[in-house]
Amino acid sequence: MKFAVIVFPGSNCDVDMFHAIKDELGEEVDYVWHDTENLDEYDAILLPGGFSYGDYLRCGAISRFANAMKAVQKAAEQGKPILGVCNGFQILVESGLLPGALMRNENLKFMCRTVQLRVENNETMFTSQYEKDEVINIPIAHGEGNYYCDEETLKQLEENNQIAFRYVENPNGSVSDIAGIVNEKGNVLGMMPHPERAVDELLGGAEGLKVFQSILKQWRETYVVNA
C-alpha cells in the first residue's frame, strides 16, 4: 500500500505521519508537496497537522485552494481513504469534504496534552481495529479544535453514525464532545487528536497505531484478497 503525506507551507506534523507509516506500519509513503496535481499513484492520502500558510484568515482557509486539494477531492470521490489530523481536519472542513467548522478553543488557549477518546463507531475503514466504546489515550495540540455544527448537521452525523471519536472529558468545547467525524461515504476522516503521535510504546503509547492498521486492513481486504 502506498500513502501520500501532503506537505503545505507551515505543516509540522508531516514527519510524524511519515514515521507512523514507514517505520511503524511498514508501508510505502512519500512526502507530496502541496502544488501536486495528481495523486493517482497513491492508495491513501494523509493531511498532517501544523499551521499551513500560518493559519492566516482561518485555519485551513488558504490551504483549501492548493492544487493538491483538487486531487484530494478526486481521491475522495474515488473512495480512497483520506485522513486529516488537526490542521488536516481543518483543511477538510474548509474544503467541504466534511461538515461543520472548527473554532477557537472554549478557553481561548492552545492545548497540548494527552486526552482520552471513546471509539463511537468501529465500523469505519479507520477504526475497525478498535472495539466499540474502547477508550484510548491520544495527544492533542491545538488552539482551534472546538468543533461546531448546527443542530440539523449534528442530527445527521448521529443518524448516519458519522461520529468516529468523542472526548471522554471535553477539552475544548466541541459540540457533543466530538473529536473526529467521517463523511457519509465513510472514506474521509477528520480528527483533532494526533494518532501519529501515539504509535510507539517507547514514546508514551501506541494506541493511535490502530487508525493506520485499520486503513491497511481495509485496503488488503479490498485489493489483495480480491486480486
Curated annotation (Swiss-Prot):
Name of the molecule in the record: Phosphoribosylformylglycinamidine synthase subunit PurQ
Organism per entry: Bacillus anthracis
Keyword Nucleus among UniProt keywords: no
The enzyme's E.C. designation: 6.3.5.3, 3.5.1.2
Molecular functions (GO terms): ATP binding; glutaminase activity; phosphoribosylformylglycinamidine synthase activity
Active site residues according to the UniProt entry: C86, H194, E196
Subcellular location: Cytoplasm
Primary localization: cytoplasm
